[in-house]
Amino acid sequence: MTDLPFVSALVQADLPVWEQCLQTEFLQKMENGTLSEGCFKSYLVEDSLYLREYAKIFAWGMTKATTMAAMRTYYSLLSFVQENEDLTRLRYLEEYGLREADIQSLPLRPESRAYLDCMIDAARTGEGEAECLMACLPCMLSYGWLFQKLLQRSPAVKDTYYGALVLDYASPGYDAACRAWAERAEAACTGLSPERAARCRAIFRACSEHELHFWEMCATPRTDI
């Protein structure tokens, strides 16, 4: 039996956590079309605040990169997040009468802050590029997996108010980007010592668990918007 590539093995090991994400109240209600406006609006605000901080992981990645190719990877990640994810999110915010500039002073919720602190600490204190990628990959890869599953199980979700968001993350373009990032991570993790590989696995698992806490949090709307 052939061993799985490092990143594929990480994903396989964490699928039970991602399955739990899929079963959270927020995503279940999104899937069946009963998600409240308050919860969805709160998610959009929290996601906006989260993405601002998430971009800092890529900055740490650039400082740890040892080749121009690696630096371009982080630049492409940042560009993809800003250009691809922003379009739909900003349109939804506009429909709710919210501007991104107006919500930047709002605080992150504790679950988001804990998640971001975990990622930033892993990227800052890690030996190099591998740790940075392990910190940011669970968010990227799990989003693609979750929304593809949502669309496969309930195709009608694409016709709901949340359909544009679901289709963004379930799209072939997003999947191709995730595959490219996973390939870069695979290259960065090739030849790691057993101790460092174990640390990378621990980072990936911790961030997957923070993803679960994030989705659990989203079932309760913010009270400050």
What are these regions (language model features)?
Residues 2-6, 115-121, 216, 220:
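Hydrophobic alpha-helical segments
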Residues 15-20, 34-64, 84, 134-144, ...:
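Alpha-helical bundle segments that constitute or directly flank the non-heme di-iron/ferroxidase center
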Residues 173-205:
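Long amphipathic all-alpha helical oligomerization modules
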Residues 199-225:
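Acidic, carboxylate-rich catalytic segments that either coordinate divalent cations
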Residues 61-65, 96, 122-126, 150-154, ...:
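Secondary-structure edge/capping motif, primarily at the C-terminal ends of alpha-helices
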Residues 11-35, 54, 182-191:
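Short alpha-helical hairpin
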Residues 1-8, 12, 223-225:
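Basic/polar N-terminal segments that are highly enriched at the extreme N-terminus
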Residues 69-176, 205, 209:
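Active-site-proximal alpha-helical scaffolds that flank and shape metal-associated catalytic sites
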